UniProtKB/Swiss-Prot annotation:
Main location: nucleus
Gene that encodes the chain: tupA
Biological role stated in the UniProt entry: Acts as a component of the trfA-tupA corepressor complex which is involved in the repression of many genes in a wide variety of physiological processes. May also be involved in the derepression of at least some target genes. The complex is recruited to target genes by interaction with DNA-bound transcriptional repressors.
Taxonomic placement: Eukaryota, Amoebozoa, Evosea, Eumycetozoa, Dictyostelia
Alphabetized InterPro entries for the sequence: G-protein_beta_WD-40_rep (IPR020472), Tscrpt_rep_Tup1_N (IPR013890), WD40/YVTN_repeat-like_dom_sf (IPR015943), WD40_repeat_CS (IPR019775), WD40_repeat_dom_sf (IPR036322), WD40_rpt (IPR001680)
Positions of WD repeats: 279-319, 325-364, 367-406, 413-452, 455-494, 501-540, 543-579
Ranges for region Disordered: 83-258
Subcellular compartments: Nucleus
Pfam family, one: Tup_N
Protein name per its UniProtKB record: General transcriptional corepressor tupA
Length: 579
């Protein structure tokens, strides 16, 4: 018995020793773990510091690059202005008409130069000089177009404006004088919906013709107009008659109130024609096609509409009767992928999803604190992303009826209102443009912030993914478009191309279904077609009397492509293009 007790005691002692050894080992491991974690945190902090330093250096380098590029552009503009002044003096002479005889010497006229200078000052607050732009032509009425590349800049003449040739310099001068006449006749610009608390002075929905800041220069222009020589009076009378014809709603002929200009330095088969003119009761803030291309949705004050693309007839109208006082502009409309629902975002800070067939509200999403400016559906129809003036973008889960993610915080989120949002074709990414000049990218499935794209000099008002999802286009108040490369590593944002050519704010951008065209709408009242592969503009369309606030292309191309424009002139227009 005694031996057994001793044996048990010995075993217990051995077990206790092993437990003590294990505890000692465990404490060593814990100590090593703490040491490793401390080292890891220190290295992570150092890495973050290095990354932040690199980011600051890159941002500083980009700012210096932008500054130097701007200085170079200013010097180029000074040189171009000398050529422009010479060509403008030639514009005021009889040599602007076709003639087989030698042109007479140009007659210099100080009054005409004053008109040009005053108009340039009114239309360009930053003293930017006019760039050389493609030569405009009148839309064809059935005959094939024959565009020639020539060093002299000659182009074909179309019926509608008489014997006078049009190039962009003449067209710009004509437009400036037409705008003066319209302002004199109207007495004040078109009132656009208020966008407080965003920067209302610069928002596209308030892009009317502001008279207060230009009254003195307008008076100077009026005095100069009264002193023009006989030839200018004849040309001005022709323009008045042309403006009168353009303002009449009845008896319009194809091409009587819209112009197309083609770039003489490139060969293109691009042709444009007007399909339907869709009159509205207020500013058209947004346009959007259904996925099958059969319907177009528009948003204006207090209502959203759906039109049949083939006939141009209104087939549905959606009005929220709960809000009956004051204005309620529909800032954004978007079809669900199956075409059964229409999402709308408005000044009431809510996202509404309408059943198109019953015209009833299916869902209402609350959560934004300010006006909603942009919406987009995911490709599977399960989510909607919205952008608001509250500096946030939100992803809404339609099935669960709640917000899945809020994109944006004090550290990496927008510093000002979100003006535009877009979902990538595969539904994995969300892009947002903001008034702080930056485009941001998030993971739509996790809500994690991925990247920021800097380079614009002013607020970003529109973003759009390319059909293959490898590029992102942005349009800005700095009058430019940028194309960002998403195909490689996102550790460094890379601007693939910058598109310059608009003379005022770029308010909307969109890709064609095959990605071969990038189109943009601007406050300068024009739509431009760009080749995203080389940054070349092929065509400029002038088909509205006020800012082109929204552009959209039909996802389906049959015999020809279709695109839509929405404008401050109370009209949306459907166009077809062949390329």
């Amino acid at each position: 018995m005694y031996g057994r007790t001793a044996r048990a005691s010995e075993l217990l002692d051995n077990l206790k020793g092993e437990i003590d050894a294990l505890n000692h080992e465990l404490s060593l491991y814990k100590h090593q773990k703490d040491d490793y974690e401390r080292k890891f945190q220190n290295q992570l902090a150092e890495l973050n510091t290095i990354q932040q330093t690199l980011y600051d250096l890159e941002r500083g380098q980009n700012k210096m690059k932008i500054h130097y590029e701007e200085e170079i552009r200013q010097l180029k503009r000074q040189l171009e202005q000398q050529n422009i002044n010479a060509s403008q003096r030639d514009l005021n002479s009889p040599s602007t008409f076709r003639s087989n005889s030698p042109a007479p010497p140009a007659q210099h006229n100080n009054n005409n130069n004053n008109i040009i200078n005053n108009n340039n000052n009114n239309n360009n607050n930053n003293n930017n000089m006019q760039r050389n732009t493609p030569t405009p032509t009148i839309p064809d009425k059935g005959q094939p177009k024959q565009r020639q590349r020539s060093g002299s800049g000659e182009f074909y003449q179309q019926p509608g404006l008489g014997p006078q040739q049009l190039n962009f310099q003449q067209l710009n001068l004509q437009q400036q004088q037409q705008q003066l006449q319209q302002q004199q006749q109207q007495g004040s610009g078109q009132s656009f919906p208020s966008l407080s608390p965003l920067d209302s002075n610069r928002h596209p929905k308030e892009m009317g013709n502001n008279m207060s800041g230009n009254s003195m220069s307008m008076n100077n222009n009026n005095n100069n107009l009264n002193k023009k020589p006989d030839m200018e009076e004849v040309k001005e009378e022709d323009r008045r008659r042309h403006d009168t014809e353009m303002s009449e709603e009845n008896g319009k002929e194809k091409g009587t109130d819209w112009l197309v200009g083609y770039n003489p330095s490139v060969q293109t088969n691009l042709n444009i024609d007007l399909l339907h003119n869709l009159q509205h009761n207020s500013v058209v803030c947004c346009v959007n096609f259904s996925n099958d291309g059969k319907y177009l949705a528009t948003g204006c004050n207090r209502s959203a509409q759906i039109y049949d693309v083939d006939t141009g007839k209104k087939v549905h109208a959606f009005v929220d009767e709960s809000e009956k006082d004051g204005d309620l502009y529909i800032r954004s409309v978007c079809f669900s992928p199956d075409g059964n629902y229409l999402a709308t975002g408005a000044e009431d800070k809510t996202v509404k999803v309408w059943d198109i067939h019953t015209k009833k509200i299916q869902h209402t999403f609350y959560g934004h604190e300010l006006d909603i400016y942009s919406l987009d559906y995911s490709s599977d129809g399960r989510f909607i992303v919205s952008g608001s003036g509250d500096k946030k973008a939100k992803i809404w889960d339609i099935e669960k009826g709640k917000c899945a993610f809020t994109l944006g915080n004090e550290e990496v989120g927008p510093k000002n209102g979100v003006t535009s949002v877009a979902m990538s074709p595969d539904g994995r990414l969300v892009a947002a443009g903001s008034l702080d000049n930056i485009v941001r990218l998030w993971d739509a499935q996790t809500g994690y912030f991925l990247e920021r794209y800097e380079g614009h000099l002013d607020s970003v008002y529109s973003v759009a993914f390319s059909p293959d999802g490898k590029s992102l286009a942005s349009g800005s108040l700095d009058k430019s478009l940028k194309l960002w490369d998403l195909s490689g590593s996102r550790s460094r944002s890379r601007c693939r191309a910058t598109f310059n050519g608009h003379k005022d704010f770029v308010l909307s951008v969109a890709f064609s279904p095959d990605g071969s065209w990038l189109i943009s709408g601007s406050k300068d009242r024009s739509v431009q077609f760009w080749d995203p592969r080389n940054g070349t503009t092929h065509m400029m369309l002038q088909g509205h009397k006020n800012s082109v606030i929204s552009v959209a292309l039909s996802p389906k191309n049959n015999s020809h492509g279709v695109f839509a424009t929405g404008s401050g002139d109370f009209r949306s227009r459907l166009w077809k293009y062949d390329s």
